[in-house]
Design a protein with these regions (language model features):
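N-terminal hydrophobic membrane-entry segments
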Residues: 1-246
Length: 246
């Protein structure tokens, strides 16, 4: 029975994956979303038959539309294989057998026969993983912070230790998307349906960044109030927020 199911699964999956895909940005994203998977648009106004393709396979000839303000990261079996920072439409091409499609001129043998046999070896499913992710190149606003208790620093003007509670917001911008993904983003966010959002309280990586921002406030206040060029006055902070941030 398992053998028959594997045959049906491999053939059915191969046929479903022959269609070219059309990938775009998912709807309903928050402004602070930094990284998320491109989603295939199976139907448009009720028209379209490409609704049963494999979730981890991108067929050759598929089109990926990159909007303004975003970059495109391509993955093959967990490895970054490409990056595009310019907006526009891009065509997916891969030498992987699972991406072969008769609609992109890959031939009948590779697209159907060989691909079905390879999938049969994996119980009917493709033995490969491909993905396209969008990374925001815009400024990511409204990242809020605050302290639950007072933080202390040595004040040069008052010549004593001063404490204060703080709250505010800061803006982030990803300047190296590849380094951001390789060194910061947890693997759980490199999956379809996941959104890496810096304001998500359940995002451990974003929470760590928040903790580092709060942890840097005390030494920053100390440096500011003990800098003779600033007049040693914490009261000047509101007029010099950019100078304090530096």
């Amino acid at each position: 029975m398992g053998l028959v199911q594997a045959v049906v699964g491999s053939v059915g999956g191969v046929l479903a994956d022959q269609w070219k895909d059309f990938y775009t940005v998912p709807s309903g994203l928050p402004a602070t979303a930094a990284l998320f998977a491109a989603v295939p648009q199976g139907t448009n106004a009720g028209r379209g038959s490409n609704t049963k393709g494999s979730s981890n396979i991108i067929s050759n000839g598929s089109k990926i539309v990159v909007p303004e303000g975003y970059g495109l990261l391509l993955f093959q079996d967990g490895k970054i294989t490409g990056f595009a920072a310019e907006p526009g439409g891009y065509e997916w091409r891969s030498d992987d057998l699972n991406s072969k499609s008769i609609f992109s001129g890959d031939g009948l043998v590779d697209s159907l026969i060989k691909q079905s046999w390879e999938r049969f070896k994996f119980g009917g499913q493709p033995g490969s993983q491909q993905a396209a992710f969008f990374v925001s190149l815009k400024e990511l606003p409204d990242n809020r912070f605050g302290t639950q208790s007072e933080i202390y620093w040595d004040d040069g003007f008052l010549n004593t230790q001063v404490g204060a509670m703080t709250r505010g917001s800061y803006t982030l911008k990803i300047v190296d998307p590849i380094l951001f993904v390789k060194n910061f983003v947890p693997a759980t966010y490199l999956q379809t349906g996941q959104v890496f959002d810096f304001t998500d309280m359940d995002n451990a990586a974003a929470s760590q960044l928040f903790n580092e921002v709060v942890g840097s406030l005390a030494p920053a206040f100390s440096l500011y109030t003990n800098d003779p060029s600033k007049g040693n006055r914490i009261s000047k902070l509101q007029q010099d927020s950019l100078g304090f941030a530096k």
